[in-house]
A protein has these predicted regions:
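Core alpha/beta nucleotide-donor-binding catalytic domains of modification enzymes
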Residues: 2-191
Length: 191
């Protein structure tokens, strides 16, 4: 059992390290979008395990849409303090009458915060399950071939590159890594 636990702990960091080695260069300012959920908690933990990154920080966007939003921000603040990672908590107002659905409006505001504060690279914790879910949703909406691309692993938004190092990792592997490393996370009731 210990051997399989060690291989799980090594698998996620090894895959993230290989992903970043292909797509990043030393000295780039790296920011993690930290919701406090399992995926982003693991991603930030892995980055600290891989070694010191002088330009590593996290951003938590406080949408205020849940009665738990303050607790989530406090959790992220405490987590980053324990890891020794700088954290920016940005409180935002989501325009509910924007013509977008609430989730799409929140996403637009969130990416606005990221583009102002992320630096060179924004790393997000989307995983295989998110990819499959997005693909299915897009196909059901009738997006055709364009929707089959689902979530891009690497894309440019303005001057910021958005990378998703966990996109080929299964949710169960991420959760197993978190349990093996005794990480805690928050569960968003809307997710």
């Amino acid at each position: 059992m210990a051997a399989s636990r060690n291989s799980l702990q090594n698998s996620v960091p090894t895959r993230v390290a290989a992903f970043l080695a292909k797509r990043t260069t030393p000295g780039e300012k790296v920011c993690v979008g930290l919701s406090g959920g399992c995926d982003s908690v693991v991603l930030l933990h892995v980055l600290t395990v891989l070694g010191p990154r002088e330009h590593l920080r996290a951003v938590h966007v406080h949408h205020g849409l849940s009665e738990n939003a303050d607790r989530w921000a406090d959790f992220c603040t405490d987590y980053c303090r324990r890891l020794g990672v700088e954290l920016l908590v940005e409180r935002v107002d989501v325009e509910r009458r924007s013509g977008l659905g609430l989730e799409a409006a929140a996403r637009a505001v969130r990416y606005g915060v990221f583009s102002r504060s992320a630096g060179d690279l924004l790393l997000l914790g989307h995983h295989q399950g998110d990819q499959a879910e997005t693909l299915l949703f897009n196909l059901l909406r009738g997006t055709g071939i364009a929707g089959a691309a689902a979530i891009p692993v690497d894309r440019l938004q303005g001057r910021m590159r958005i990378l998703r190092p966990l996109l080929d990792v299964a949710r169960r592997e991420i959760e197993a890594y978190a349990r093996d490393c005794q990480l805690v996370w928050i569960d968003d009731e809307s997710n």
